[in-house]
């Protein structure tokens, strides 16, 4: 083994937080702090390994330096294919780098410093609200996982950057590490909340939470990088505790048992990294036995030491103390070489070069896939939801229902099935301690395949067996006895003696892990699906609020929420008083602390925006706080139960909350009134706890569930609207209709954002094939778009409404008929329907539809026809849209004892504006007079009546403000119709239209007698009303009259 520390690898004496070796072992990347920025550097690996290349001036050492990050880079990771490099930083961004042709200058040097390779940022991923601490590419580069101090893990679609597939919320502390299961079935994340969460990648639900090994841990590490073994059998965590001493916890895939760990480091373990491949080595005893196969991993700690472990050894292969001057933060293995690199906060890296005799040789990818197939029945590269779920134990399909699987024993001699697999050899050391040596079961062609792992679990002298064969062997059905020549494990003393092992700290006297932790027995016949916690207990949060925290009245927990420049730090159980525990909330911005707030009950949920902070407690109380001053905006509100989600509308004018018992409330903050009060208990009973919750600017709630269903509430229908379902219609409808800039249009497209984020689109991508004819697909897509239009009208989402009208136009132009197209266009030319569609600007949509239809040459005739109709409609509506007659009204008998027929003009027309400005005019000898003022007017028609002033004459001045009433009836004035198009505008100044002649307000009107006029009773002959040829126009003084009868 050679230990190399190249001094020329540095970040100008700044910290290096991450290192990763490229798949071809020709280069490696480092990430850390630069000069007032975050820095990513790609280095040539050859000068590190070769002294000749190091001193050759023609061999470049630094290949490329990228300083585009605004803050320190915490993690760099190469993709599996080596084409992409991902970097995560304190600036909340993730950048995806790709190599481009030519060379470039180092950013910020003015071209003085040249890069030998050109790497450019092709994608910038935005979604985290805090520092990004760790990254991990999935097998086959399907996804990229990132974790942050905002307590979330985001799954990015690596095939469609910058789209995200899911946001995993469940941690209540800073998430400091993520790792993919090599089979693609699970994703593990480790957090400061003293837990590891296992997520199911098939539906991104929480599968299991592991807390026991971390109960004594503190948040003393910058990162917590955990790692899966290459065979998928074991997950090794970072910082754990055993008997007061730091350990690296071993978690078995079978039942998630946690009874074994690596011990010996004096301070917290910060990072763990398995070699990417299963290693093999021929035994050195000269026997012709098959090669020994095992896994290898490295462990780094805050005690500045590095240890390398092999599953075929009872002790660490090598331990190097004081390798750096500060904590070790990252580790990486060379996939093609026996190479290990580590980096430290002190700004340096170290490289350990092993020989194949020392470390072993990596088996080929085909051999590793064969091992995976034998253990799981499927090649792991097809996992991650791209096909059927990985079957953990395919032999179970062969078992009759009700039968229990039997063990398939193996022996280490030619006598078949003489001893059970758990047989071990036990010896005594000189000091009286027991040494238990497990029997090694090598890989062979005829029997089940496994990797034996012997791991130090307490002190340096005693070992505990961890055999992956127990999972596979324990589930095989009974079969004919098979002879196998198992080779007992050899300690490989000659190999170990060549290397200075060093000594782990022997002062740690810990009890065996089996005594410390009691794991539930795992039934091999029980599916792993049964080990999940109930869905109703998984309080996953929405995209708009942190998750509902699992806290108790006396429990302690901390979490941070950030938005823009503001940051809220919550500490439950901060202070203990004689009346109970107090929770503390601290608000700060980028410069200073703003305020402190104490709550008498633990906080289980909170959210914040630019103006306000929402605090929800365990006792069901809710507090709305001003972010600037910390003063309450609302008094404390009591809810029926604690809040699961809370969210602000995008414009910060509304705030909503959803409780555990299904209570939904939305408040208007400025008016301090409730905007919506509803219940969704029936939805919770049907789908479980809500996973997403948000509020639109129009006050519409959007609720999403882990099942893929999402809903919104309609106050007019008093019902829940179905926004999304997880079926083929939804998948095919959304497919191909997402805008290219969807990530920037989430606030303008609330419906589509909810549908895309509820896993209806991404969970089907690549896993569902449409094998049937296209006829149903075309019909289904058109009907889906039509339903989307109705949903947009209900949500009052105008931008989305225009988008779906374009989509429907394109589909009808491509697959529709002329009859169907005409029905669609005629509807847009019609007047808006009362109720939910009043806000729809139909003429604007019509223009948009015609623009979309114009490129289709086969529809030119229809386009020209409806273009002319649109022009005529605009012209007519400009004249009539604000003078729409009121619905026919019935009245009591007039003084003449008769009433006019429905729909006929009878007496006079009175026009008002907002109840304040009005101009009254009489219709003389059947002539019609309409008055238009400002931007909207209304016209009412009364029955036969007499108009008189209240004892004084009226004068006309300015635009005039008057009110008129009938002596025989009183009619309600309908609300004005909204403007449907920018082209339809009222005139800037008031105008009076008399017999189709338009006069401006400044024009001189014909002289009118302003004295009171007696109007003769209406005549019913011929159905027409007759009046005296005189009229009065009221001026600034209102005209009042006595009412004798009212309808």
UniProtKB/Swiss-Prot annotation:
It comes from the Eukaryota. It holds the Pfam family HIRA_B. One of its GO terms (molecular function) is histone chaperone activity. It is found in: Nucleus. Residues 401-435, 509-549, 882-914, 933-1047 are annotated as: Disordered. Residues 409-424, 509-518, 889-901 have a biased composition (Polar residues). WD repeats lie at residues 11-53, 68-107, 127-166, 170-209, 218-263, 264-319, 323-364. CDD domains: WD40. The modification Phosphoserine is found at residue 519. One of its GO terms (cellular component) is chromatin. Keywords: Chromatin regulator, Nucleus, Phosphoprotein, Repeat, Repressor, Transcription, Transcription regulation, WD repeat. Disulfide bonds: none annotated. GO terms for biological process: chromatin organization; chromatin remodeling; DNA-templated transcription; regulation of DNA-templated transcription; sperm DNA decondensation. Residues 933-972, 1015-1047 have a biased composition (Low complexity). Belongs to the WD repeat HIR1 family. Required for the periodic repression of histone gene transcription during the cell cycle. Required for replication-independent chromatin assembly. Promotes remodeling of sperm chromatin following fertilization via the incorporation of histone H3.3 and histone H4. This is Protein HIRA homolog. It comes from Drosophila melanogaster. The gene is Hira.
């Amino acid at each position: 083994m050679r230990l190399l520390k190249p001094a020329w690898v540095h970040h100008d004496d700044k910290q290096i937080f991450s290192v990763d070796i490229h798949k071809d072992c020709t280069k490696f990347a480092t990430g850390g702090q630069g000069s007032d920025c975050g820095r990513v550097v790609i280095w040539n690996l050859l000068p590190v390994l070769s002294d000749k290349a190091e001193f050759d001036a023609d061999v470049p050492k630094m290949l490329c330096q990228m300083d585009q990050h605004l803050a320190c880079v915490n993690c760099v990771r190469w993709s599996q294919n080596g084409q992409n490099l991902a970097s995560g930083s304190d600036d909340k961004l993730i950048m995806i780098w790709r190599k481009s042709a030519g060379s470039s200058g180092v950013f910020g040097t003015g071209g003085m410093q040249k890069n030998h390779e050109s790497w450019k940022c092709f994608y910038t991923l935005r979604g985290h609200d805090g520092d990004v601490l760790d990254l991990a590419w999935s097998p086959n580069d399907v996804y990229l996982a990132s974790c942050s101090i905002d307590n979330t893990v985001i799954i990015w679609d690596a095939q469609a950057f910058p789209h995200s597939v899911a946001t995993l919320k469940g941690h209540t502390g800073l998430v400091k590490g993520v790792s993919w299961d090599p089979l693609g079935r699970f994703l593990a994340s480790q957090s400061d909340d003293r837990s590891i969460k296992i997520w199911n990648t098939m539906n991104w639900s929480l599968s299991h939470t592991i807390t026991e090994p971390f109960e004594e841990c503190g948040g003393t590490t910058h990162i917590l990088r955990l790692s899966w073994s290459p065979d998928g059998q074991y997950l090794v965590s970072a910082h754990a505790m055993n008997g007061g001493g730091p350990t690296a916890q071993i978690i078995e895939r079978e039942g998630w048992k946690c009874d074994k760990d690596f011990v010996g480091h004096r301070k917290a373990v910060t990072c763990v990294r398995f070699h990417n491949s299963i290693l093999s080595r021929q035994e050195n005893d000269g026997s012709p036995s098959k090669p020994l196969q095992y896994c290898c991993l490295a462990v780094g700690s805050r005690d500045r030491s590095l240890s390398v472990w092999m599953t075929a050894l009872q002790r660490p292969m090598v331990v190097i103390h004081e390798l750096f001057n500060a904590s070790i933060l990252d580790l990486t293995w060379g996939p093609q070489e026996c190479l290990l690199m580590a980096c430290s906060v002190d700004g340096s890296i170290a490289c350990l070069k092993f020989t194949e005799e020392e470390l072993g040789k990596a088996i080929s990818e085909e051999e590793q896939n064969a091992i995976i197939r034998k253990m799981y029945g499927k090649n792991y590269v097809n996992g991650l939801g791209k096909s059927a779920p990985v079957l953990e134990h395919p032999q179970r399909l062969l078992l009759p229902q009700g039968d229990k699987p039997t063990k398939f024993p193996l022996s280490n001699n030619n006598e078949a099935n003489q001893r059970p697999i758990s047989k071990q050899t036990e010896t005594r050391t000189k000091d009286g301690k027991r040494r238990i040596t497990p029997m090694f079961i090598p890989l062979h062609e005829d029997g089940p395949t496994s990797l034996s792992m012997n791991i130090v679990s307490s002190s340096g002298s005693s070992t505990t067996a961890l055999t992956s064969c127990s999972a596979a062997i324990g589930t095989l059905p009974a079969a004919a006895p098979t002879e196998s020549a198992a080779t007992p494990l050899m300690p490989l003393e000659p190999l170990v003696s060549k290397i200075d092992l060093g000594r782990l700290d022997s002062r740690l006297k810990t009890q065996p892990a089996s005594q410390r932790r009691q794991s539930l027995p795992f039934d091999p016949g029980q599916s792993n699906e049964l080990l999940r916690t109930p869905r109703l207990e998984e309080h996953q949060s929405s995209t708009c609020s942190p998750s509902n925290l699992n806290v108790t009245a006396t429990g302690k927990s901390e979490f941070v929420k950030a938005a823009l420049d503001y940051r809220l730090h919550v500490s439950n159980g901060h202070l203990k008083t004689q009346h109970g525990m107090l929770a503390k909330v601290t608000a700060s911005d980028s410069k200073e602390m703003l305020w402190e707030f104490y709550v008498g009950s633990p906080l289980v949920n909170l959210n914040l925006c630019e103006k306000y902070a929402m605090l929800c407690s365990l006792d069901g109380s809710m507090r709305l706080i001003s972010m600037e001053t910390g003063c309450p905006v609302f008094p404390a509100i009591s809810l029926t139960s604690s809040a699961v989600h809370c969210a602000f509308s995008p414009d910060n004018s509304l705030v909503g909350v959803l409780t555990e018992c299904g209570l939904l409330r939305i408040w208007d903050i400025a008016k301090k009134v409730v905007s919506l009060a509803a219940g969704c208990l029936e939805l919770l009973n049907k789908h479980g706890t809500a996973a997403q919750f948000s509020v639109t600017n129009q006050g519409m709630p959007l609720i999403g569930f882990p099942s893929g269903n999402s809903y919104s509430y309609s106050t007019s229908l008093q019902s829940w609207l179905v926004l999304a379902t997880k079926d083929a219609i939804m998948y095919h409808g959304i497919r191909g209709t997402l805008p290219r800039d969807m990530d920037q249009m989430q606030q303008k497209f609330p419906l589509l954002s909810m549908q895309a984020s509820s896993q209806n689109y991404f969970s089907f991508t690549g896993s569902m094939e449409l094998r049937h004819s296209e006829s149903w697909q075309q019909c289904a897509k058109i009907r889906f778009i039509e339903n989307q239009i109705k949903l947009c009208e209900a949500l009052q989402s105008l931008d989305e409404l225009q988008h779906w009208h374009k989509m429907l136009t394109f589909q009808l132009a491509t697959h529709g008929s002329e009859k169907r197209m005409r029905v669609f266009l005629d509807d847009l030319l019609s007047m808006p329907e009362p109720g939910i569609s009043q806000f729809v600007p139909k003429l604007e949509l019509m223009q948009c539809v015609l623009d979309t239809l114009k490129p289709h040459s086969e529809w030119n005739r229809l386009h020209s026809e409806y273009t002319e109709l649109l022009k005529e409609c605009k012209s007519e509506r400009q004249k009539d849209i604000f003078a729409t007659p009121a619905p026919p009204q019935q009245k009591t008998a007039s003084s003449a004892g008769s009433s006019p027929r429905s729909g006929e003009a009878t007496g006079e027309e009175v026009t008002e504006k907002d109840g304040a400005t009005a101009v009254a005019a009489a219709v003389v000898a059947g002539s019609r007079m309409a008055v238009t003022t400002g931007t909207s007017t209304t016209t009412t028609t009364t029955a036969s009546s007499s108009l008189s002033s209240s004892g004084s004459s009226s004068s006309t001045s300015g635009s005039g403000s008057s009110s008129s009433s009938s002596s025989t009836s009183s009619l309600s004035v309908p609300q004005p119709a909204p403007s449907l198009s920018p082209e339809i505008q009222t005139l800037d100044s008031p105008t009076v239209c008399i017999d189709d002649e338009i006069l401006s307000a400044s024009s001189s009107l014909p002289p009118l007698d302003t004295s009171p006029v007696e109007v003769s009773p209406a005549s019913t002959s011929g159905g027409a009303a007759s009046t005296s040829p005189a009229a009065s126009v009221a001026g600034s003084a209102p005209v009042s009259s006595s009412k004798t009868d009212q309808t």
